[in-house]
Curated annotation (Swiss-Prot):
One of its GO terms (cellular component) is spindle. The gene is Jtb. InterPro entries: JTB. It comes from Rattus norvegicus (Rat). The lineage of its organism: Eukaryota, Metazoa, Chordata, Craniata, Vertebrata. Belongs to the JTB family. GO terms for biological process: apoptotic mitochondrial changes; mitotic cell cycle; mitotic cytokinesis; positive regulation of protein kinase activity; regulation of cell population proliferation. This is Protein JTB. Interacts with AURKA, AURKB, BIRC5 and INCENP. May be a component of the CPC at least composed of BIRC5/survivin, CDCA8/borealin, INCENP and AURKB/Aurora-B. Keywords: Apoptosis, Cell cycle, Cell division, Cytoplasm, Cytoskeleton, Membrane, Mitochondrion, Mitosis, Signal, Transmembrane, Transmembrane helix. It comes from the Eukaryota. The chain crosses the membrane at residues 106-126. It holds the Pfam family JTB. GO terms for molecular function: protein kinase binding. It is a single-pass type I membrane protein.
Protein backbone atom coordinates (compact mmCIF):
# COMPACT_ATOMS: atom_id res chain seq x y z
CA UNK A 1 0.00 0.00 0.00
CA UNK A 2 1.30 3.45 -0.88
CA UNK A 3 2.39 5.85 1.84
CA UNK A 4 -0.45 8.27 2.53
CA UNK A 5 -2.96 6.16 0.64
CA UNK A 6 -6.43 5.77 2.05
CA UNK A 7 -8.15 2.49 2.83
CA UNK A 8 -9.32 2.13 -0.74
CA UNK A 9 -5.93 2.77 -2.28
CA UNK A 10 -6.55 6.32 -3.56
CA UNK A 11 -4.70 9.32 -2.16
CA UNK A 12 -6.82 11.77 -0.20
CA UNK A 13 -7.32 14.08 -3.19
CA UNK A 14 -7.90 11.16 -5.58
CA UNK A 15 -11.67 11.32 -5.34
CA UNK A 16 -11.59 15.01 -6.23
CA UNK A 17 -9.48 14.25 -9.30
CA UNK A 18 -11.96 11.60 -10.46
CA UNK A 19 -14.84 14.04 -10.01
CA UNK A 20 -13.02 16.73 -11.99
CA UNK A 21 -12.21 14.27 -14.77
CA UNK A 22 -15.83 13.14 -14.98
CA UNK A 23 -17.02 16.77 -15.05
CA UNK A 24 -14.54 17.64 -17.81
CA UNK A 25 -15.65 14.68 -19.91
CA UNK A 26 -19.28 15.72 -19.47
CA UNK A 27 -18.45 19.25 -20.69
CA UNK A 28 -16.64 17.92 -23.75
CA UNK A 29 -19.56 15.61 -24.51
CA UNK A 30 -22.01 18.52 -24.28
CA UNK A 31 -20.05 20.51 -26.86
CA UNK A 32 -20.10 17.80 -29.54
CA UNK A 33 -20.32 19.39 -33.01
CA UNK A 34 -23.39 19.04 -35.18
CA UNK A 35 -23.02 16.16 -37.61
CA UNK A 36 -22.63 17.25 -41.23
CA UNK A 37 -25.36 14.84 -42.40
CA UNK A 38 -28.04 16.72 -40.49
CA UNK A 39 -26.99 20.19 -41.64
CA UNK A 40 -29.22 20.29 -44.68
CA UNK A 41 -32.47 18.61 -45.58
CA UNK A 42 -34.51 19.56 -48.61
CA UNK A 43 -38.14 18.82 -49.44
CA UNK A 44 -37.24 17.43 -52.87
CA UNK A 45 -35.56 14.05 -53.41
CA UNK A 46 -32.05 15.46 -52.99
CA UNK A 47 -30.67 18.98 -52.85
CA UNK A 48 -29.04 20.12 -56.07
CA UNK A 49 -25.89 21.25 -54.23
CA UNK A 50 -25.10 17.62 -53.36
CA UNK A 51 -24.80 16.53 -56.99
CA UNK A 52 -23.73 19.63 -58.91
CA UNK A 53 -21.69 22.81 -58.65
CA UNK A 54 -23.31 25.80 -56.96
CA UNK A 55 -22.74 29.50 -56.37
CA UNK A 56 -23.48 31.18 -53.05
CA UNK A 57 -25.82 34.08 -53.84
CA UNK A 58 -26.42 35.18 -50.25
CA UNK A 59 -23.85 34.70 -47.47
CA UNK A 60 -24.53 32.83 -44.23
CA UNK A 61 -27.15 34.79 -42.26
CA UNK A 62 -29.27 34.06 -39.19
CA UNK A 63 -32.72 32.65 -39.93
CA UNK A 64 -35.78 34.76 -39.23
CA UNK A 65 -38.56 33.40 -37.00
CA UNK A 66 -40.61 32.61 -40.10
CA UNK A 67 -37.70 30.77 -41.75
CA UNK A 68 -37.09 28.71 -38.61
CA UNK A 69 -40.69 27.49 -38.73
CA UNK A 70 -40.91 26.90 -42.49
CA UNK A 71 -37.41 26.04 -43.73
CA UNK A 72 -35.98 22.72 -42.51
CA UNK A 73 -32.41 23.89 -43.24
CA UNK A 74 -32.71 26.46 -40.42
CA UNK A 75 -33.47 23.83 -37.80
CA UNK A 76 -30.00 22.48 -37.08
CA UNK A 77 -27.79 25.60 -36.92
CA UNK A 78 -30.14 28.58 -37.12
CA UNK A 79 -28.11 29.96 -40.04
CA UNK A 80 -28.74 29.57 -43.75
CA UNK A 81 -27.15 30.65 -47.04
CA UNK A 82 -28.92 31.01 -50.36
CA UNK A 83 -27.32 29.14 -53.25
CA UNK A 84 -27.92 28.76 -56.98
CA UNK A 85 -27.02 25.47 -58.61
CA UNK A 86 -25.10 25.91 -61.88
CA UNK A 87 -26.66 23.21 -64.08
CA UNK A 88 -30.29 23.25 -62.99
CA UNK A 89 -30.39 26.99 -62.09
CA UNK A 90 -32.40 26.11 -58.96
CA UNK A 91 -32.35 28.46 -55.99
CA UNK A 92 -32.13 26.62 -52.69
CA UNK A 93 -31.18 27.17 -49.09
CA UNK A 94 -28.25 25.38 -47.48
CA UNK A 95 -27.57 25.22 -43.76
CA UNK A 96 -24.26 26.76 -42.72
CA UNK A 97 -22.16 27.47 -39.66
CA UNK A 98 -21.79 31.13 -38.77
CA UNK A 99 -18.27 32.47 -38.23
CA UNK A 100 -19.57 34.35 -35.17
CA UNK A 101 -21.06 31.15 -33.74
CA UNK A 102 -17.82 29.26 -34.38
CA UNK A 103 -15.81 32.03 -32.71
CA UNK A 104 -18.11 31.95 -29.67
CA UNK A 105 -17.76 28.17 -29.37
CA UNK A 106 -13.97 28.44 -29.75
CA UNK A 107 -13.60 30.97 -26.93
CA UNK A 108 -15.97 28.98 -24.74
CA UNK A 109 -13.79 25.91 -25.28
CA UNK A 110 -10.61 27.89 -24.59
CA UNK A 111 -12.11 29.22 -21.35
CA UNK A 112 -13.00 25.72 -20.21
CA UNK A 113 -9.49 24.47 -21.03
CA UNK A 114 -7.84 27.32 -19.10
CA UNK A 115 -10.19 26.75 -16.15
CA UNK A 116 -9.41 23.03 -16.03
CA UNK A 117 -5.68 23.76 -16.35
CA UNK A 118 -5.85 26.17 -13.39
CA UNK A 119 -7.71 23.63 -11.26
CA UNK A 120 -5.14 20.93 -11.97
CA UNK A 121 -2.25 23.36 -11.42
CA UNK A 122 -3.68 24.10 -7.97
CA UNK A 123 -3.99 20.37 -7.29
CA UNK A 124 -0.34 19.87 -8.27
CA UNK A 125 0.78 22.68 -5.95
CA UNK A 126 -1.26 21.28 -3.05
CA UNK A 127 0.12 17.78 -3.59
CA UNK A 128 3.69 19.09 -3.85
CA UNK A 129 3.29 20.89 -0.52
CA UNK A 130 1.97 17.69 1.09
CA UNK A 131 4.95 15.73 -0.19
CA UNK A 132 7.37 18.43 0.98
CA UNK A 133 5.84 18.33 4.48
CA UNK A 134 6.17 14.53 4.60
CA UNK A 135 9.80 14.70 3.46
CA UNK A 136 10.60 17.36 6.10
CA UNK A 137 8.90 15.24 8.76
CA UNK A 138 10.99 12.19 7.78
CA UNK A 139 14.20 14.25 7.89
CA UNK A 140 13.20 15.68 11.29
CA UNK A 141 12.59 12.17 12.67
CA UNK A 142 15.93 10.95 11.32
CA UNK A 143 17.74 13.88 12.93
CA UNK A 144 15.95 13.29 16.26
CA UNK A 145 16.93 9.63 16.27
CA UNK A 146 20.65 10.48 16.05
Amino acid sequence: MLVGAGRRGLPRGGHLCWLLCAFTLKLCEAEAPVREEKLSVSTSTSPCWLVEEFVVTEECTPCSNFQIKTTPECGSTGYVEKITCSSSKRNEFKSCRSALLEQHLFWKFEGIVVGVALVFACLVIIRQRQLDRKALEKVRKQIESI
